Amino acid sequence: MTDAINPTLIERGRKVFAGDWHFIWASPSIETLPPMAGIEVAFAGRSNVGKSSLINALTGRNALARTSNTPGRTQELIFFDGPTDAGLRLVDMPGYGYAAASKAKVASWTSLIHKFLQGRATLARVYVLIDGRHGLKDVDLDILKTLDKSAVSYQIVFTKADQVKAAELEQRIAATKTVLAKHPAAFPELLMTSSRTGAGMPELRAAMIRLLDERGA
């Protein structure tokens, strides 16, 4: 992305995410969602792709989002609010693609995610996290189709990019861009991140600031 690396956006993003971020709500069902407020951005991805770690790295708080070595632990929509004047809310979505999950649990997660995507007017973008070591999987493609149908803008974010050789990463980026060309709701540019090193976090923060500007927040 080009605009998102504007130094002004980078600095504004740094200030917003250096503020007070805190957990506000956990929703196991669509009926228990918090009232809509501000601009929401959600993070989706396969189980253990690193969603919670990325949210912690973004906000500089190691324990804001609970991390787990147990795939599929996050079964709720988890909401985090930042500084009041920022008007930005983060949503940690349930991980998908956990093979050991029961059919009933998968159906419940799927229903929750679909209803959330289709009925949340304040949801401005979904960041779909992809493990940079593995690239897109079939279950990721299913989520992209769901997002297309919901007409929700989304962007691919590679996690754990520091654990992939540069040549392999470039191949996965090229392959992913080819796939995204067929998805109308997809933002064309990818973001490379590492929660361990902090790489890509300034750019991701800046992207969200630009989104706030576009929405007039």
Curated annotation (Swiss-Prot):
Cofactors: Mg(2+)
SUPFAM superfamilies for this protein: P-loop containing nucleoside triphosphate hydrolases (SSF52540)
GO cellular component, one term: cytosol
Ranges for domain EngB-type G: 37-214
Sequence positions that bind Mg(2+): 52, 74
InterPro entries per UniProt: G_ENGB_dom (IPR030393), GTP-bd (IPR006073), GTP-bd_ribosome_bio_YsxC (IPR019987), P-loop_NTPase (IPR027417)
CDD domains: YihA_EngB
Residues where GTP binds: 45-52, 72-76, 92-95, 159-162, 193-195
Gene3D superfamilies: P-loop containing nucleotide triphosphate hydrolases (3.40.50.300)
GO MF assignments: GTP binding; metal ion binding
UniProt keyword Ribonucleoprotein present: no
Any one GO BP annotation for this protein: division septum assembly
Keywords: Cell cycle, Cell division, GTP-binding, Magnesium, Metal-binding, Nucleotide-binding, Septation
Pfam families: MMR_HSR1 (PF01926)
Function statement: Necessary for normal cell division and for the maintenance of normal septation.
Family statement: Belongs to the TRAFAC class TrmE-Era-EngA-EngB-Septin-like GTPase superfamily. EngB GTPase family.
NCBIfam families xrefs: GTPase_YsxC
PANTHER family registered for this protein in UniProt: ENGB-TYPE G DOMAIN-CONTAINING PROTEIN, MSS1/TRME-RELATED GTP-BINDING PROTEIN
This protein's name: Probable GTP-binding protein EngB
